[in-house]
């Protein structure tokens, strides 16, 4: 229930806090996961960012410019928010059929991604911006939807291909 509540949360800080709390409770043995809930088709999301088609995303020009840095931080924060939901979804959707260690690993992934999102969101705030200030695309979650019936496809497509590609195709990220 705690994992599903985090998945459904629509406010990002609340989602992060619920995810981190669920991880602490899971690893301290205070959370019993009964795997009797099925996740909705989409995670809870805030009203912003506006989700647009990947081909309609604005191009980032000068990576040294403040606006380009904010855009890059926002894009990475969006990937991390999706990664939280992908990890939570995989626990709820496939955990009942897997050993406990599977759930342990994916709860840890969700906790790590929540921590990463928080760090990026704090950087955005330092730049006088915030998560949701810029548009984003829904490609990661669309792939999750198409693999919702098949654990192996999900494990191959989403974390190994799309998330890595999302981080690797940015020239400034490759350089760093």
Regions inferred by a protein language model and the residue ranges of each:
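Non-heme di-metal
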Residues: 1-176
């Amino acid at each position: 229930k705690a994992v599903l509540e985090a998945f459904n949360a629509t406010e990002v800080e609340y989602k992060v806090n619920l995810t981190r709390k669920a991880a602490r409770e899971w690893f301290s043995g205070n959370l019993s996961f009964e795997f009797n809930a099925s996740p909705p088709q989409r995670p809870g999301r805030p009203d912003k960012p506006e989700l647009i088609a990947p081909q309609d995303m604005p191009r980032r020009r000068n990576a040294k410019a403040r606006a380009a840095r904010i855009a890059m931080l926002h894009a990475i924060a969006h990937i991390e928010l999706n990664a939280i939901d992908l990890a939570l979804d995989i626990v709820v959707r496939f955990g009942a059929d897997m050993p406990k260690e599977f759930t342990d690993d994916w709860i840890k992934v969700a906790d790590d991604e929540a921590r990463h999102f928080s760090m990026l969101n704090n950087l955005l705030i330092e730049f006088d911006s915030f998560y949701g200030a810029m548009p984003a695309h829904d490609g990661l979650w669309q792939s999750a939807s198409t693999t919702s019936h098949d654990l192996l496809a999900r494990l191959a497509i989403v974390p190994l291909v799309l998330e890595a590609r999302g981080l690797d195709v940015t020239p400034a990220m490759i350089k760093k």
